[in-house]
């Protein structure tokens, strides 16, 4: 049982990272969708496996059987989960739940920043705040840093974040990384992909790739010089240097090899998620069957 659950869990994480290596060869919108699905799917596979191990271990404990009315035949009717593995699974699930709660709380705190709190600040800050309605917050310091054409880029970039609902992708990726810390690199890739997507939308809006590259570079340099950390859904966000380099090049296409490797990773991830789901379902069905539960 343990190996049957650990194997698809490992395959899911490896497949996710393998497919994620294709990020730079995909259009930013495709990369955002692909990476988000990969991170969410890999986290789901890992959590399903941990839940199955934790449930299997709990079902073997006589004390819990008396409390919940489980039948004793469970203890001798299937492969037992070793105590270190079972306890580790429960600890990992608890840590995941706490980590996700903390991550979501911190993100909500950032999103509560109001226009009044930031607009008059001398620090160069610009970011989008999702909601109904969503809003774009640009500080006085950022406006003074950029010329009029570059300001237009900033607003186009931030409105793209709102229009494309990029916060939803970030929520999934952040929750996945909080639940499974191994997936933190994928979360960073999703943040970078959403910024690249907004950059390309800004290019469509202003019609000048070099202008967008210059605006991104100046915003990032000003923020760095002021000690301002990159903000989610902000033009000074993830990977400014790599974004500028991408903007200085013409838009790239997608090769057959890229699609093939990406598809292979997605298939491997899907199989792993399905495998862990089936294993968990079989465990629950097994307990219900031999205990005569309905």
Regions found by a protein language model. Name each.
Residues 1-120:
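N-terminal membrane-targeting/anchoring modules of bacterial envelope and secretion proteins
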Residues 4-12, 16-17, 75, 79-110, ...:
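Cytosolic-facing loops and C-terminal tails of multi-pass membrane proteins
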Residues 34, 157, 198, 244:
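Divalent metal-coordination and catalytic microenvironments
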Residues 37, 175, 215-219:
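Short acidic/histidine-centered micro-motifs embedded in hydrophobic/aromatic stretches
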Residues 84-159, 164-167, 171:
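Peri-catalytic and regulatory segments of divalent metal-dependent proteins
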Residues 165-187, 191:
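Post-HEXXH active-site segment of zinc metalloproteases
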Residues 169-172, 208-217:
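Acidic/histidine metal-binding catalytic segments
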Residues 192-207:
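An active-site-proximal "capping" alpha-helix that borders the catalytic cofactor pocket
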């Amino acid at each position: 049982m343990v190996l049957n659950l650990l194997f698809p869990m490992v395959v899911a994480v490896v497949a996710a990272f393998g497919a994620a290596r294709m990020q730079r060869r995909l259009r930013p919108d495709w990369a955002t969708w692909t990476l988000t699905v990969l991170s969410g799917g890999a986290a789901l596979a890992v959590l399903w496996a941990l839940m199955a191990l934790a449930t299997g271990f709990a079902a073997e404990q006589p004390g819990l059987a008396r409390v919940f009315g489980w039948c004793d035949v469970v203890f001798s009717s299937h492969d037992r989960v070793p105590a270190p593995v079972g306890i580790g699974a429960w600890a990992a699930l608890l840590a995941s739940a706490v980590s996700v709660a903390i991550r979501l709380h911190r993100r909500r705190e950032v999103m509560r920043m109001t226009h009044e709190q930031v607009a008059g600040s001398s620090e160069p800050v610009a970011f989008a705040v999702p909601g109904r309605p969503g809003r774009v917050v640009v500080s006085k310091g950022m406006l003074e840093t950029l010329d009029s054409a570059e300001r237009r880029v900033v607003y186009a970039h931030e409105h793209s974040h709102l229009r494309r609902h990029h916060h939803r992708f970030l929520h999934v990726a952040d929750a996945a990384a909080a639940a499974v810390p191994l997936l933190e690199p994928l979360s960073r890739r999703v943040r970078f992909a959403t910024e690249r997507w907004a950059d390309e939308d800004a290019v469509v809006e202003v019609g000048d790739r070099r202008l967008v590259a210059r605006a991104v570079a100046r915003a990032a340099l000003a923020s760095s010089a002021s000690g301002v950390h990159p903000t989610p859904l902000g033009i000074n966000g993830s990977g400014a240097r790599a974004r500028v380099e991408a903007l200085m090049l013409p838009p790239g296409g997608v090769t057959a090899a890229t699609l093939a490797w990406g598809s292979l990773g997605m298939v491997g991830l899907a199989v792993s998620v399905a495998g862990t789901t089936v294993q968990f379902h079989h465990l629950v069905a097994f307990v219900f069957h031999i205990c005569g539960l309905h």
